[in-house]
Amino acid sequence: MRDFRFWLRAIGGLWGACLLSGCLGVNPTMDMLTTFLPGKEPALMVAKGYEYLLIEIDGRKTAMALGARQEVIGAGDVMVHEHWYSGQREMIHMVNGRIYTALGLTVEWRRQQSSPPIWASLAASQVPVTWQREIDVMPGYRFGQTDRIETQVGSAPFGAPAQAGGTQWFVDHVRSPQPLGGDWVYKQHFAVHQGRVVYSEQCLSPNVCFKFKHLGLVQ
């Protein structure tokens, strides 16, 4: 019930801000996500006392509000599930900082089955870790698409913001089959501080790539 009341207050405020601003832009995904008055710098209209995720796509910024956070323990590892909502009620579900599902956007991941390596184990590994994720992608009814991923300790990508001391960077090398044939090969980057992803660069498709930064609790 508390999560539901939070969602009504935080998302309601963001949705109202979106209506005031007109939600106009160039990128269709940004049009759907926009929750602030137009401009490159985020004039964020957010509610105090709640946690937000800053999102950048094509150089424009917006915010999503945390609707729920849950820790699930499996095989001795803690999996942190977070559900982030925009002012237009789009939702991005992240697990340990990685996009797991995304609904209401121009590209949706409706289901995922994967077992990505835990950040702590990656930090201790001297070699890349190879794994797979199976996702259902819309539009196009691409059910069971299998991406092959190699993850390893890395360095900050060009243009990434400075991070606190002790932050460790990781990089994904992703090979994703495309509907017209061939593979889309790209990188994803994650900054992990005290076991938590505080900044990342991730993609849903070749045309929908995000930069995520945790804003924390807005006072």
For every predicted segment, state its role.
Residues 2-14:
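Bacterial N-terminal signal peptides that target proteins for export
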Residues 24-101, 106-111, 125-219:
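Acidic, serine/threonine-rich low-complexity disordered tracts
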Residues 113-121:
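A small/polar (G/S/T-enriched), proline-flanked helix-loop surface module common
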Residues 13-16, 124:
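Generic surface-pattern signal
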Residues 19-22:
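C-terminal motif of bacterial Sec signal peptides marking the signal peptidase cleavage site
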